[in-house]
């Protein structure tokens, strides 16, 4: 049988609620490559944002926490390069990773333009540069 505890919902901040799934089989909700996580996050966000005007933070078996830690480690040399050259970009990032990286880079560089761009293949990445220049 499938063992999953009832989800807990709590206030994360004034604009965000935290929805947590745990239990022995909670990781099955994440799916291969996080596809189920993305789908569930998308469904919950669209419903809750439309009905209540709130954002969501979905945590399943520490998936989001682990993703945040991984992205923070990845961003260390990226941030260093941007500090040295004044501009830079990330690799192609997917799903929740682009959101986490965007928040981190905006916090690290509040004086710069930090935005999401789409590559030729449709993958998304983040660019950081000065506001007053044409964005490449």
Predicted regions, residues:
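RNA-contacting regions in translation and RNA-metabolism proteins
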Residues: 1-136
């Amino acid at each position: 049988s499938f063992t999953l505890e009832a989800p807990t919902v709590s206030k994360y901040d004034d604009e965000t609620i935290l929805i947590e799934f745990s239990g022995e089989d909670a990781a099955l909700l994440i799916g291969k490559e996080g596809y189920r996580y993305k789908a569930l996050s998308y469904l919950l966000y669209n419903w809750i944002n439309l009905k209540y005007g709130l954002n969501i933070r979905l945590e399943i078996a520490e998936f989001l926490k682990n993703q945040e830690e991984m992205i923070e480690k990845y961003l260390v040399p990226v941030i260093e390069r941007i500090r040295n050259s004044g501009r830079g970009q990330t690799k192609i990032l997917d799903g929740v990773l682009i959101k986490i990286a965007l928040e981190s880079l905006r916090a690290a560089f509040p004086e710069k333009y930090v935005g999401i761009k789409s590559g030729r293949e449709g993958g998304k990445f983040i660019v950081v540069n000065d506001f007053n220049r044409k964005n490449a």
